[in-house]
Curated annotation (Swiss-Prot):
Entry's EC annotation: 4.2.1.126
Record-stated family: Belongs to the GCKR-like family. MurNAc-6-P etherase subfamily.
Protein's UniProt name: N-acetylmuramic acid 6-phosphate etherase
GO BP, sorted A to Z: amino sugar catabolic process; N-acetylmuramic acid catabolic process; peptidoglycan turnover
Keywords for this protein: Carbohydrate metabolism, Lyase
Domain SIS, residue spans: 68-231
Function: Specifically catalyzes the cleavage of the D-lactyl ether substituent of MurNAc 6-phosphate, producing GlcNAc 6-phosphate and D-lactate.
Extra remark: A lyase-type mechanism (elimination/hydration) is suggested for the cleavage of the lactyl ether bond of MurNAc 6-phosphate, with the formation of an alpha,beta-unsaturated aldehyde intermediate with (E)-stereochemistry, followed by the syn addition of water to give product.
Gene that encodes it: murQ
Pathway: Amino-sugar metabolism; N-acetylmuramate degradation
Subunit structure: Homodimer.
Single annotated GO MF: carbohydrate derivative binding
Catalytic activity: N-acetyl-D-muramate 6-phosphate + H2O = N-acetyl-D-glucosamine 6-phosphate + (R)-lactate
Length: 316
């Protein structure tokens, strides 16, 4: 029978017990003896830590948003790279960008060790192959114009370190997200986001607080970058892709809220604009046809507010 432990080629120096994410949380040492009420209460109280951790990383998050926006505005793409929970969170955030912001599916991509199969069935062993991170990026034509966010809660994942090292090697933007102090694990990157959520209630289970903080950070990075790119007007997702009943309703409500357009007229405008809320707003507000409205948007880098400012009697 194959000795899987021998195959892993572990060494005494591989002990990860010093990492913050692997330490024992004294608040939960009697976790298995708690009542259901006490369990739920403890988890709710401990889940305040991700918010504190993300708030402490605001300076690095600002730097990352601005750098990502610059790259995307210049034609680059954003990649999330990770294994296990970290990789799945990247895939989740990337998958939400096209319906929310009508972005090209290639603009924001989630790269998970093990590929799509690892979304449903764990392939955690692949995270130990450092060269695989580089290989997965190369297969997607990752270039110096692009951005990489490497996600590794414990800061030691070889797959992620390999991807980040490759990004730095070719002068792409390399951003790291981890949940341990830099003195415990260094990562090759230009922007280092440390979300120090502390030991997990279930020791080592970084799908908990570390995962929550990571998801919050990814929400901030993608959403703020899209805001800076002009895909939002006020707090409305004016680049929403009206691809189902819920999103069509949202598009119609945006038209009503911003331009007092009733649902019948709104439907007509969306049909004429091929589902574009921005074009529909310009058509209605400025009395333009769809083609002219689209050209006006392009002239203003798809920034609705500046395009509206060119029109008389506009709502900007």
């Amino acid at each position: 029978m194959t000795n899987v432990f021998a195959d892993l080629n572990l060494h005494p120096s591989d002990n990860r017990g010093h990492l913050l994410t692997e330490k024992v949380n004294p608040k939960s040492e009697c976790l298995d003896q708690l009542t259901t009420e006490s369990l739920v209460t403890l988890f709710c109280e401990e889940d305040r830590e991700p918010q504190r951790a993300v708030a402490a990383a605001i300076p690095e998050l600002i730097q990352a948003v601005e750098a990502i926006t610059d790259r995307l505005r210049s034609g680059g793409r954003l990649f999330y790279l990770g294994a296990g929970t970290s990789g799945r969170l990247g895939v989740l955030d990337a998958a939400e960008c096209p319906p929310t912001f009508c972005s090209d599916p290639d603009l924001v991509q989630g790269v998970l060790a093990g590929g799509s199969a690892a979304l449903l069935k764990s392939s955690e062993g692949l995270e130990d192959i450092e060269q695989l991170g580089k290989k997965d990026l190369e297969e997607r034509d990752f270039s110096p114009a692009d951005c990489l966010v490497g996600i590794a809660a414990g800061g030691t994942t070889p797959y992620v370190k390999g991807g980040l090292a490759y990004a730095k090697e070719i002068n792409a933007l390399a951003i790291a997200i981890s949940c341990v102090p830099i003195e415990q694990a260094e990562l090759p990157c230009s922007i280092d986001i440390r979300l120090l959520t502390g030991p997990e209630l279930l020791t080592g289970s970084t799908r908990l607080k570390a995962g929550t903080a990571t998801k919050m950070a990814l929400n901030i990075l993608s959403t703020c970058a899209m805001v800076r790119l002009g895909k939002v007007f006020g707090n409305r997702m004016v680049d929403v892709a009206a691809t189902n009943i819920k999103l069509m309703d949202r598009a119609l409500r945006i038209l009503h809220d911003l331009a007092d357009v009733d649902r019948v007229r709104g439907t007509e405008l969306l049909q004429a604009s091929d589902g574009s809320v921005k074009v529909a707003l310009l058509m209605h507000t400025c009395g333009l046809d769809a083609e002219t409205a689209q050209k006006l948007l392009i002239e203003h880098n798809n920034q609705l507010r500046t395009a509206l400012a060119r029109c008389k009697n506009c709502i900007a």
